[in-house]
Design a protein with these regions (language model features):
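Intrinsically disordered, low-complexity boundary segments flanking structured domains
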Residues: 5-13, 56-64, 112-117, 177-185, ...
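Active-site helix/loop of acyl-thioester processing domains in fatty-acid/polyketide metabolism
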Residues: 41-63, 212-245
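HotDog/MaoC-like acyl-thioester-processing domains
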Residues: 18-22, 73, 77-87, 94-176, ...
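Long, contiguous hydrophobic alpha-helical segments, chiefly transmembrane helices and signal peptides
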Residues: 24-26, 31, 37, 42-46, ...
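Non-catalytic linker/capping segments at the edges of enzyme domains
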Residues: 2-41, 132, 141-217, 318, ...
């Protein structure tokens, strides 16, 4: 019996081992302000692996230049820090969609492993779809993965979400979200309001933001005069003088559309839940002038002592700011 996916992948439930799809070594330039490989470079590796999986399996066969493959839903779980010089292998395979409650499309599971330590550095559940470049609409281009396909795998228990839901998110509009976002900037986790412009050099030959560029990195890019400043989460100090910041543990990003060169993008973010040492946030990204929803991003992070490299309770001033501004109705 086939498991149906609207989009381009149908699969039968017979699972095999994960397949090696990408190999790399962590470069010094990929190390951020927390002293470890930044989230964006995990995403770079898994995006390459996703394309490689499509090619090897024969799922991604471009029929005309007006169609492309897009990651429309990306769940990430980060497990162990990786440092400069570490060798990393990215492995994965397709999964039956009945294992998840995600949006339609072809869903795959990936892991980034350190073969020297044996650690699983991060795991991912990704849904991709064929998209018409001109209309930005999904294309119905069904393909079947046979029951004996070596590319069909199962999500291990440790790769499943811990805190975030993979259900279809409630979207909301710019008119609904903007009035409830406070002007107060709660330290860390990209809360509050942020704006930036899509540069021409960020775009493909059609003038649309390239598929491999994450909207969050457009919104929070460094200015040219900040090239020598370490990138990554900002550093803070508590009343005891400890250096602390926020380490991302889980993320989920859903893409609805890609902006064009010159578009002004606005990100509206707030905490939706928190505990003694952690917080969960949601960010909505819109084209400012039209109100078009581009994407929704959820993040779970823990407060860490940067010197002791361990989780600590959220400092009181930050906790109070979270309490004043959080939006539990969006959790």
């Amino acid at each position: 019996m086939l498991v149906e996916c609207r989009g381009f992948l149908n699969v039968k439930k017979q699972m095999t081992d994960l397949h090696l799809l990408h190999e790399s070594i962590v470069d010094e330039t990929e190390i951020d302000s927390l002293g470890h490989m930044n989230v964006r470079y995990y995403m770079f590796r898994v995006a390459r692996a996703n394309v490689e999986l499509m090619k090897r399996s024969g799922v991604f066969v471009r029929k005309n230049p007006n169609q492309l493959i897009r990651r429309v839903d990306t769940y990430s779980r980060f497990r162990t820090e990786q440092f400069a010089g570490a060798k990393l292998n990215t492995l994965g395979g397709f999964i039956a969609t009945e294992q998840t409650d995600r949006i339609d499309g072809a869903t795959a599971y990936f892991e980034i492993r350190n073969p020297d330590s044996g650690d699983v550095a991060a795991s991912f559940v990704i849904t991709s779809d064929f998209v018409d470049v001109s209309t930005q609409e999904p294309i119905d281009a069904s393909t079947t993965i046979d029951s004996d396909s070596k590319y069909l795998v199962e999500i291990p228990d440790y790769g499943r979400p811990r805190s975030l839901s993979l259900a279809k998110p409630d979207v909301g509009t710019l008119e609904e979200i903007e009035p409830v976002i406070s002007d107060e900037q709660v330290p860390g986790m990209m809360s509050g309001r942020h704006e930036n412009v899509v540069y021409t050099e960020d775009c493909d030959d059609r003038g649309r933001l390239r598929e491999e560029i994450d909207l969050m990195f457009v919104l929070h890019r460094r200015n040219p005069d900040e090239e020598d400043v370490s990138f990554g989460p900002p550093e803070f100090r508590d009343l005891q003088g400890r250096r602390y910041s926020w380490a991302v543990m889980e993320t989920r990003s859903v893409v609805f559309a890609r902006p064009e060169a010159g578009n002004k993008i606005v990100s509206l973010g707030a905490d939706t839940a928190y505990g003694e040492k952690w917080r969960q946030s949601r960010r909505w990204m819109f084209v400012k002038d039209t109100g078009q929803l581009l994407g929704i991003s959820d993040t779970v992070g823990i407060c860490i002592d940067l010197d002791a490299r361990k989780a600590i309770p959220i400092p009181e001033a930050t906790r109070e700011a979270i309490e004043r501004n959080y939006l539990p109705q969006f959790a």
